[in-house]
Amino acid sequence: MQDENGMIPMGEPDDVDDPAASPDVPPTVKARNAVQQEVSRLLDALAPERAAHRVGTKTNEVERYRTPRGCVLQTTAGAVTVSWFPDSAQGAELGELQVVAWRGTVSHPGSSKRTSGAQLVEEMVLRPGESRMGGMEWRAVDGTTYSTEVLAARCETLLERWTNGGDA
């Protein structure tokens, strides 16, 4: 099973078996903690829990609301919501992240302000997984992968479409 140089082939990166991807093997506590850290990093990038406010400055009229498992980024024309749904401790999955772009005003949890509602424009469902480089990545249903930083930028891009009055 050696090649012409006497080396044992290790296979292609796609051929490597990922035990965490196997539906019968529950994720480890370490994997669950790593995913929770990535969720926190994403939410901190989009809507920090303690945003620094300066008197007299505007943040492009984006209202950022943090929830225990997500955030709402609201402009006058639209919004982007990010929600994390962890799997149970006994489940074989780590959970899923939903990123939804809305036209209109989304009411955030705990708000007494009610509006006419919002229309869903675009939705991405992502699952966490280990990247080939050893870090965490987010995999969309269509196979697209995002690092946490790139996913945060993608959410901001979706929000910009509404801030600038564009259509998704």
Regions found by a protein language model. Name each.
Residues 1-65, 70:
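Charge-rich, low-complexity N-terminal segments
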Residues 68-168:
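Intrinsic disorder/low-complexity polar-acidic segments
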